[in-house]
Amino acid sequence: MDNKLDIKAFLDKDEQKDLLRLLTAGSVDDGKSTLIGRLLFDSKKLYEDQLDALERDSKRVGNAGEHIDYALLLDGLKAEREQGITIDVAYRYFSTNGRKFIIADTPGHEQYTRNMITGGSTANLAIILVDARTGVITQTRRHTFLVSLLGIKHVVLAVNKMDLVDFSEERFDEIVSEYKKFVEPLGIPDVNCIPLSALDGDNVVDKSERTPWYKGISLLDFLETVHIDNDHNFTDFRFPVQYVLRPNLDFRGFCGKVASGIVRKGDTVMALPSGKTSKVKSIVTYDGELDYAFPPQSVTLTLEDEIDVSRGEMLVHPDNLPIVDRNFEAMMVWMDEEPMDINKSFFIKQTTNLSRTRIDAIKYKVDVNTMEHLSIDNGQLTKDNLPLQLNQIARVVLTTAKELFFDPYKKNKSCGSFILIDPITNNTSAVGMIIDRVEMKDMAATDDIPVLDLSKLDIAPEHHAAIEKVVKELERQGLSIKVIK
């Protein structure tokens, strides 16, 4: 039959669609979960069994009166449904004719800041909800600050519950003016404001007749058309090596994800930290070879020369190098329920690199509600200074055991971000966004990297290579040793 559904063609077409990752944030009862539920409902992306369950749950535990409680599509935890709030990050996937979406519904409470950081770490766009009755409040400012901290370039201010202010243009303009005045110094390049009613569906999927004064497009139309391709850094080639692939003696490839930039066959690349160069022989994928690769593609690169490269090292263009250093400043969010121990060292995971690190100084803490910088005397950590607690944000100085290869987070999110790992519990203690390198001349005397002087060992020179191989494996596991021949 001519009308028979071609499943392969449908899947191929769906695979070619662009993917937009977005998060929603707002105060309690601003309607985040209701908005996403309405988006799924009106775009006909729910199955019949989901609709039946939604109707049953709305009558049993819903908070929308006689209406369907669309928030129940997102609020999955029992505690969330009982309290009518979002606690965990809820993810939902759906697609339209124009694009695929992954939505992270993040909690609005201050005590769940780490959940919002987690949900927004991969987002291209943020929807900040405000209640038309209350306007821009402290939580709105906090969420917007966190969005700017994460480097999200596109923000939608969704002024919800417009039906409760009679769809007043004057009220909408007042909220927009106040918000744009606040957001301007944060440096978010793309801010759009949409009046809507999530419960009734106004301006969610289709334009509403109840806002004739609004000349923009609906929320879904905006999400389908917002341009995100330029958000990637296509200038600075960075290829953190994740795995060395050697299936046989005739093939040696370096696997990983292109973090930024573009690499082509024949390009000259440099391996860091060795500084050795070679040319790209081939770019291999599961579907065959490519002439070039770009972010966020995962590929295997083969080189014309046999140079020593292992996991944690990086391939770059020799005329465009990242910062190579052990000392840097960063904005850091504390994620562990255990307060920061000033005497503890951590593992730092940055791209595929792993090293030991210590926190040398806290420049200041940030009050996420007022944006105020809370300074710490001389920037030094002492027992008299309260260490970082769960969800607190600070500008810190770190020193790593071995050199890292990084760019500022604002320039390159992939190579400018890191996590700290507690070496005892393996918990993620903190996440960070690198600002820049920092001079640490005053701390040179406290350099605690152990030194191995091969000339002082009673070992034949032919065994030095084996020792260096062991040292390199220790470095790969985050334990640095300086070798002197």
Swiss-Prot record:
According to the record, the residues making up region (G3) are: 105-108
The residues covered by the tr-type G domain are 17-232
Q: What is the protein's known function?
A: With CysD forms the ATP sulfurylase (ATPS) that catalyzes the adenylation of sulfate producing adenosine 5'-phosphosulfate (APS) and diphosphate, the first enzymatic step in sulfur assimilation pathway. APS synthesis involves the formation of a high-energy phosphoric-sulfuric acid anhydride bond driven by GTP hydrolysis by CysN coupled to ATP hydrolysis by CysD.
Q: For the region G5, what residue ranges are annotated? A: 197-199
Q: How does it assemble?
A: Heterodimer composed of CysD, the smaller subunit, and CysN.
**PROSITE patterns named in the record:** G_TR_1 (PS00301), G_TR_2 (PS51722)
Q: Give the pathway annotation.
A: Sulfur metabolism; hydrogen sulfide biosynthesis; sulfite from sulfate: step 1/3
This protein's name: Sulfate adenylyltransferase subunit 1
Q: Mind telling me which HAMAP family this protein's record contains?
A: Sulf_adenylyltr_sub1
| Span list, region G2 | 84-88
Report the Gene3D superfamilies cross-referenced here.
P-loop containing nucleotide triphosphate hydrolases, Translation factors
Q: Supply the SUPFAM superfamilies for this chain.
A: EF-Tu/eEF-1alpha/eIF2-gamma C-terminal domain, P-loop containing nucleoside triphosphate hydrolases, Translation proteins
Residues engaged in binding GTP: 26-33, 105-109, 160-163
Q: List the Gene Ontology MF annotations in alphabetical order.
A: ATP binding; GTP binding; GTPase activity; sulfate adenylyltransferase (ATP) activity
Q: Which InterPro entries match?
A: CysN_GTP-bd (IPR041757), CysN_II (IPR044138), CysN_NoDQ_III (IPR044139), G_TR_CS (IPR031157), GTP-eEF1A_C (IPR054696), P-loop_NTPase (IPR027417), SO4_adenylTrfase_lsu (IPR011779), T_Tr_GTP-bd_dom (IPR000795)
Q: Which Pfam families match?
A: GTP-eEF1A_C, GTP_EFTU
- Its Gene Ontology biological processes? hydrogen sulfide biosynthetic process; sulfate assimilation; sulfur compound metabolic process
- The first-level EC class reads transferase
Listed under catalytic activity are:
sulfate + ATP + H(+) = adenosine 5'-phosphosulfate + diphosphate
Q: Where is this region: G1?
A: 26-33
